[in-house]
């Protein structure tokens, strides 16, 4: 089982992890702002 282009696979994985990281930071920022400004 050899991947035709492993570089593209790692780039896709990187983009997905970056997206989830930004989403997590956004959710934490919303929670903290609602906690502080309430």
UniProtKB/Swiss-Prot annotation:
The keyword Thylakoid applies. It is a single-pass membrane protein. The gene is psbL. PSII is composed of 1 copy each of membrane proteins PsbA, PsbB, PsbC, PsbD, PsbE, PsbF, PsbH, PsbI, PsbJ, PsbK, PsbL, PsbM, PsbT, PsbX, PsbY, PsbZ, Psb30/Ycf12, at least 3 peripheral proteins of the oxygen-evolving complex and a large number of cofactors. It forms dimeric complexes. Pfam families: PsbL. Belongs to the PsbL family. One of the components of the core complex of photosystem II (PSII). PSII is a light-driven water:plastoquinone oxidoreductase that uses light energy to abstract electrons from H(2)O, generating O(2) and a proton gradient subsequently used for ATP formation. It consists of a core antenna complex that captures photons, and an electron transfer chain that converts photonic excitation into a charge separation. This subunit is found at the monomer-monomer interface and is required for correct PSII assembly and/or dimerization. The chain crosses the membrane at residues 17-37. This is Photosystem II reaction center protein L. It comes from the Eukaryota. GO terms for cellular component: chloroplast thylakoid membrane; photosystem II reaction center. Keywords: Chloroplast, Membrane, Photosynthesis, Photosystem II, Plastid, Reaction center, Thylakoid, Transmembrane, Transmembrane helix. It is found in: Plastid, Chloroplast thylakoid membrane. One of its GO terms (biological process) is photosynthesis. The lineage of its organism: Eukaryota, Viridiplantae, Streptophyta, Zygnematophyceae, Zygnematophycidae.
């Amino acid at each position: 089982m050899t991947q035709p282009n492993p570089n593209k696979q790692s780039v896709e994985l990187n983009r997905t992890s970056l997206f989830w990281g930004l989403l997590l930071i956004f959710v934490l920022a919303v929670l903290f702002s609602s906690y502080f400004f309430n």
